[in-house]
C-alpha cells in the first residue's frame, strides 16, 4: 500500500481488524485492495459502472475483496452488515446525496463509521488547475457542496460528525506529469469544458511547466468522519 493510502486511511479511521468494509463508489478499485490490507478486513467494492468494476476486478488481490454493482442511493447490502463505509470523491456525483446518506445508516452495524473524502466549494481556489482553466471555476462552484452542507446531509440521516480534516495530497510529481494526467481525461469537470477552453488551458499549463523547475502538484481534500 503506497504512502498516500496510508496517510488517508490511518489517522482518522478506527482499527477494524477482521471486520467488514464497503468501498462505496469504488470506481476502478483504487482504494479497495488497500482497505483490505490496511484493516485486514473483508471489503466489498460497489459501483454503478460495469466497465469500472471490470477494471477493478483486474486489480483484485487475494480472496478478501469482491465487487458488486450498485449505487450509493441503493446499496445492495442487508442492514447491520458492515463496520465501515468508505467513500472517496463521490459526493459531487451523487444524484441524491440525502438518500445516499440515509442508505448508509442502516447498513452500518452499531458503532460503525461512514468516512467520506470530498472536494468542497471552500477549496476551489486551491485546486491546481483552476488558474489554467478559468471556465472550470463556475462548474466547480455549481457541483461542489460546502463543508457545512455535507455535514448537514449526514446529520439529517442520523449521523453525528466525529471529525472534519483537511488533507493535502500530492497528485503528480511535476506540472508536466500533471498535464499528462489531465490530458488522459479522468477529471469530469474538465471533460465538460468546451474544446477551446480545454485546449487553451492545456497550452497554458504546458507553458508554465516548461518555465519552472520540477515540483510536485498537490490538491486539498476534505475528510469527513461520521458515526
Regions found by a protein language model. Give the residues of each.
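Short alpha-helix
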Residues: 142-157
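Short catalytic micro-motifs in class I SAM-dependent methyltransferases
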Residues: 89-93
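Class I SAM-dependent methyltransferase SAM/SAH-binding core
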Residues: 22, 28-74
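Conserved class I S-adenosyl-L-methionine
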Residues: 113-142
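Conserved Class I S-adenosyl-L-methionine
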Residues: 28, 162-227
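A short glycine-rich, Lys/Arg-flanked "PGG" loop and its adjoining helix->strand segment in the class I
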Residues: 98-110
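A conserved beta-strand element that flanks and buttresses the S-adenosyl-L-methionine
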Residues: 86
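Conserved alpha-helix/loop element of class I SAM-dependent methyltransferases that forms part
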Residues: 2-19, 34
Amino acid at each position: 500500500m503506497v504512502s498516500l493510502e496510508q496517510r488517508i486511511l490511518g489517522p482518522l479511521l478506527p482499527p477494524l481488524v477482521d471486520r467488514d468494509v464497503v468501498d462505496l463508489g469504488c470506481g476502478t478499485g483504487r482504494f479497495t485492495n488497500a482497505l483490505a490490507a490496511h484493516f485486514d478486513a473483508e471489503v466489498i467494492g460497489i459501483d454503478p459502472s460495469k466497465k469500472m468494476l471490470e477494471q477493478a476486478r483486474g486489480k483484485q488481490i487475494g480472496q478478501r475483496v469482491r465487487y458488486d454493482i450498485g449505487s450509493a442511493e441503493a446499496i445492495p447490502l442487508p442492514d447491520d452488515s458492515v463496520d465501515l463505509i468508505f467513500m472517496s470523491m463521490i459526493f459531487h456525483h451523487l444524484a441524491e446525496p440525502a438518500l445516499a446518506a440515509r442508505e448508509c445508516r442502516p447498513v452500518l452495524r452499531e458503532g460503525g463509521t461512514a468516512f467520506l473524502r470530498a472536494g468542497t466549494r471552500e477549496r476551489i481556489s486551491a485546486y491546481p488547475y483552476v488558474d489554467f482553466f478559468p471556465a472550470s471555476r463556475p462548474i466547480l462552484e455549481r457541483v461542489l457542496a460546502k463543508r457545512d452542507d455535507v455535514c448537514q446531509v449526514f446529520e439529517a440521516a442520523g449521523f453525528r460528525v466525529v471529525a472534519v480534516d483537511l488533507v493535502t495530497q500530492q497528485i503528480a510529481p511535476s506540472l508536466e506529469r500533471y498535464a499528462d494526467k489531465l490530458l488522459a481525461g479522468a477529471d469530469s469537470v474538465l471533460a465538460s469544458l468546451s474544446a477551446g477552453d480545454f485546449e487553451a488551458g492545456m497550452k497554458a499549463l504546458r507553458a508554465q511547466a516548461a518555465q519552472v523547475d520540477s515540483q510536485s502538484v498537490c490538491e486539498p481534500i476534505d475528510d469527513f468522519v461520521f458515526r
